[in-house]
């Protein structure tokens, strides 16, 4: 059976909490769009986690977590989250990242804060 959690608003709807509850029995959990500006807090046996990039499925050994091609992937945020789950000894992380993601790096977020666009040269 396929289950989808889709927001009808701009956030703060409880999607992360519902996704975490469903992830306990899921084979695959996919984050299909969005950026690191949104997030959800997960509290479990490993500790308290604020996830902005990783799907909730990372805490379940039977679940594959997928970061899909609609995600604006903030690399420093992803690395921080990966380091946090490793440091808290979350076992058996199965994570797949689409090769079609838009990768954001530090210079992208800095230019956005300054109100400037980044362009290729």
What function would you assign to each model-found segment?
Residues 1-121:
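Non-transmembrane, aqueous-exposed alpha-helical and coiled segments at domain scale
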